[in-house]
Amino acid sequence: MITKHNISNLFEFVKKQKKSNILRIDLINKSFVLSQHTKTNHIFIDKNGVNFNCKIEKQINEIAQILLPIVMMKKKFYIGQIGQSLDGKIALLNGNSHYINDKNSISYLHSLRSICDAVVVGVNTIKKDNPLLTTRAIKGSNPQRIIIDPSLKLTNKYQIFKDGLSNIIFTHSNIKKNLNNTKILKLPERNFTNLVYQHIN
């Protein structure tokens, strides 16, 4: 069974070992322990792929098949996440969307944050939701916060400017503004979206 605890351990290990050439998952009493040591029962991941040398629970197998090969690849991966109601809505009529996801979805979202180098949002997400964009529901590292704010409308009243963590804002505005713990990167207005994409990559 996938739990908040074991998926957190897996994500945290993958995060720390992104540059490693060899990863191992050792199974002990139908559970798994992550290490770089050779054991009898293990899953061996090398540059040629994933080799399973033992039985593994289906759910953990699925996690490993998706996440661990990513470690061995050099190209960037992008993960999109959206929460919506059963009838396809992402907010109430008054714009309130806190929280449209349940607790399990929130834990999953924070798990994704813990393995990502950065989280990218638009200015309206900050203005309407006032999020922290940090990893809190599980143990894990925080991603770099990147905000796309073309007209530089944000002010220091939002949470992301009050917790001491760093932010990067992309804008094409000429407005001079001092935002706490924030690096503001000005790009030309023409082809702004494409230029942001190129910088993120």
Regions found by a protein language model. Give the residues of each.
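Active-site ligand-binding patch in enzyme domains
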Residues: 2-86, 90-201
